């Protein structure tokens, strides 16, 4: 059974949901576009929790009703009740765990769009080829979710591979899903260039950063040095006759970003500034995380971007996420963007972890009050 404290929190959310529902029918709110959108957004953010709470109550009522029938004089009713209870009782614990997860505080960045950086790591040309496949995997996943993807910068490698690429992904709560992708992705397979049929191991590093608005990060124009150059293709050849590509250097931190995908220098500069703000925002987020908890030094997982988070084993057609001990097969589907189950496994794992940490914090606070 859920503890009284948990039920109290859930009931408070339900009460707030009812208040917001009433507000939406208030003419004063309906006539104010900004306020209406704000109220509707807050209501939508807790609707799933309220729906789950009401379904949980109905489940308990059904269990209680069938348990009462076990004492009925009619043997047929007793048998039907037993069959119903065999179906209902196993649903109680998972429903309670899901409700607890809904109480985990949301990451304030979850609603943000993201910038994704993909870099070939160890493994030479094979790493570049896998980097290109990982990039395509995210593009296909974004398409499945109805998100918009823009290629901001890319550096081509041999055999059609990619040394590094930068993407922006825009849509509904993109960061809440893609934040689990930061880290080292390892691939094990026989490269196309391997004549002996030996399995090679290569790596690709992925960094996912929430986009930062100007209100999040203030950049002093005097701190930014801009260089312009001609855009180059995958083989290094110039593909533009004007200096439209832009490179920005943030002098205080040494961060360098570049964008050459647009024909307009102004558009490239705007996109490069977006990348720079995201990187500076990530640095500030990292500083705050380190200050709160020295053992947590990245967005997710146990450490920084050098953490090996996932292995793609092609000979065994198996993907393993090492952080959450999750395994699945059918790698062709994975590389075609079918990764929602992996992301869901990560989300559930880290939400449960956050809930445990919050519970320990509340228990400690209660002890101090006592």
UniProtKB/Swiss-Prot annotation:
Keywords: Cytoplasm, Methylation, Protein biosynthesis. One of its GO terms (cellular component) is cytoplasm. Methylated by PrmC. Methylation increases the termination efficiency of RF1. Residues 286-311 are annotated as: Disordered. The modification N5-methylglutamine is found at residue 237. Its main location: cytoplasm. It comes from the Bacteria. GO terms for molecular function: translation release factor activity, codon specific. Residues 286-296 have a biased composition (Basic and acidic residues). Peptide chain release factor 1 directs the termination of translation in response to the peptide chain termination codons UAG and UAA. This is Peptide chain release factor 1.
């Amino acid at each position: 059974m859920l503890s009284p404290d948990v039920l109290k929190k859930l009931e408070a959310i339900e009460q707030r949901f009812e208040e917001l529902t009433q507000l939406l029918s208030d003419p004063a709110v309906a006539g104010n576009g900004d306020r209406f959108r704000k109220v509707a957004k807050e209501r939508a953010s807790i609707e799933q929790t309220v729906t789950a709470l009401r379904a949980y109550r109905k489940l308990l009522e059904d269990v209680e009703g069938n348990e009462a029938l076990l004492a009925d004089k009619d043997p047929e009713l007793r048998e039907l009740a037993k069959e119903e209870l065999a179906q209902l009782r196993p649903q109680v614990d998972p429903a309670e765990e899901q409700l607890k997860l809904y109480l985990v505080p949301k990451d304030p960045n979850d609603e943000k769009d993201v910038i994704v950086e993909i870099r070939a790591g160890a493994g030479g040309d094979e790493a570049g080829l896998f980097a290109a496949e990982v990039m395509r995997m995210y593009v296909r996943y974004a398409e499945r979710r109805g998100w918009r993807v823009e290629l901001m910068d890319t550096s081509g490698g041999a055999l059609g591979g990619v040394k590094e690429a930068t993407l922006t992904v825009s849509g509904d709560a993109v960061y809440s899903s893609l934040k689990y992708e930061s880290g080292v992705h390892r691939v094990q397979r026989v490269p196309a260039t391997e004549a002996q049929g030996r399995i090679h191991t290569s790596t690709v590093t992925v960094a996912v950063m929430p986009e930062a608005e100007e209100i999040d990060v203030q950049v002093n124009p005097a701190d930014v040095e801009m260089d312009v150059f001609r855009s180059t293709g995958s083989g290094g050849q110039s593909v533009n006759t004007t200096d439209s590509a832009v490179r920005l250097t943030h002098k205080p931190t040494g961060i360098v970003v570049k964008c050459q995908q647009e024909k307009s220098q102004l558009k490239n500069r705007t996109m490069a500034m977006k990348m720079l703000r995201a990187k500076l925002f990530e640095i500030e987020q990292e500083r705050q995380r380190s200050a709160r908890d020295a053992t947590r030094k990245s967005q997710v997982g146990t450490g920084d971007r050098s953490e090996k988070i996932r292995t793609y084993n092609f000979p065994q057609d198996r993907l393993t996420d090492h952080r959450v001990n999750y395994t699945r097969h059918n790698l062709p589907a994975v590389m075609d963007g079918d990764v929602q189950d992996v992301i869901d496994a990560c989300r559930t794992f880290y939400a449960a972890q956050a809930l445990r940490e919050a519970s320990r914090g509340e228990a400690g606070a209660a002890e101090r009050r006592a």
